[in-house]
């Protein structure tokens, strides 16, 4: 769940909606400070900003469920965001479409592999390996020897173009052969 004192930036709220819809869903509480204290909704027009976040900046748009609660004489909005069925949910940013995911209480930009995982899930591609190709076996052996790999290193190991490498990494993630990690210093890494 996430707390918002108020909704003043539709694009920023769209990032949170994207992250929740692309992950496991969640709740957005408007009128609550970051420390959890109740401030109450100050501007009823915030609902239009919320609608704009979903309908203008989020692709595809989400249907939002909003409930108003009275707490200590103040109104708090509870917005339920379900895990989406049409992933990736992307935000129309100034520099193009970006999908977000949620980790703990933060939103992060999803990389191409994670977006490909969502695409393969949506297209109902097989979640079980039939057999590994030579290139996949080469990558798996590399991971046994060296622990983790980036997308660019995986492309070199398998001697493939980036786009094909992304497809393979996504498939191996979906098959639960490899896992991904992300940190702000090293970016996305893949390991057994």
Where are these regions (language model features)?
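Conserved N-terminal catalytic/coupling substructures associated with nucleotide/phosphate chemistry
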Residues: 1-192
């Amino acid at each position: 769940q996430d707390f918002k004192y108020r909704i003043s930036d539709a694009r920023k709220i769209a990032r949170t909606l994207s992250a929740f819809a692309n992950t496991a869903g969640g709740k957005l509480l408007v009128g609550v400070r970051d420390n959890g204290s109740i401030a109450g909704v100050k501007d009823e027009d915030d609902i239009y900003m919320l609608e704009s976040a979903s309908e203008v900046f989020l692709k595809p748009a989400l249907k939002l469920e909003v409930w108003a609660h009275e707490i200590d004489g103040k109104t708090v909005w509870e917005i339920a965001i379900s895990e989406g069925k049409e992933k990736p949910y992307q935000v129309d940013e100034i520099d193009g479409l970006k999908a977000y995911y949620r980790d703990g209480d933060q939103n992060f930009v999803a990389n191409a592999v994670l977006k490909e995982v969502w695409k393969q899930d949506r297209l109902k591609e097989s979640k079980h390996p039939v057999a590994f190709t030579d290139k996949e076996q080469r990558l798996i052996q590399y991971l046994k020897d060296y622990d983790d790999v980036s997308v660019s290193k995986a492309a070199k190991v398998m001697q493939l173009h980036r786009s094909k490498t992304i497809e393979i990494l996504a498939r191996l993630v979906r098959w639960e052969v490899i896992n991904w990690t992300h940190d702000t210093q090293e970016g996305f890494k893949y390991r057994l």
